[in-house]
């Protein structure tokens, strides 16, 4: 697997607002169309209590890390065939790294 760039928080914030915020939050335990992303690093796929995941997500059994998120965000439907997520992915490595950096930093903050 290629080395993951460090990522830029502010650029990642823009990517999150443009590509993720419609379905996900990162600052609370709330769910929208998609589950909260708060605490995703180190969490097993399909594990947010009360969220109705696809069978594919529940059965994947991946633990989310910088590396697994980096690969997943390239092409979610290829990484987890059968996922309900409609997001096509981020082809640019820098955008994926920026988004991961933003999520990592937001997850360090107390939830609202």
UniProtKB/Swiss-Prot annotation:
Official protein name in the record: Cytochrome c type-1
The keyword Heme belongs to this UniProt entry's keyword annotation: yes
Post-translational modification (record): Binds 1 heme c group covalently per subunit.
Keyword Electron transport: yes
Keywords: Electron transport, Heme, Iron, Metal-binding, Mitochondrion, Respiratory chain, Transport
Residues the entry annotates as binding heme c: 20, 23-24, 85
Subcellular location: Mitochondrion intermembrane space
GO CC, one annotated term: mitochondrial intermembrane space
Coiled coil: none
Family from the record: Belongs to the cytochrome c family.
Function of the molecule: Electron carrier between complex III (ubiquinol-cytochrome c oxireductase) and complex IV (cytochrome c oxidase).
GO molecular function: electron transfer activity; heme binding; metal ion binding
Annotated source species: Ascaris suum (Pig roundworm)
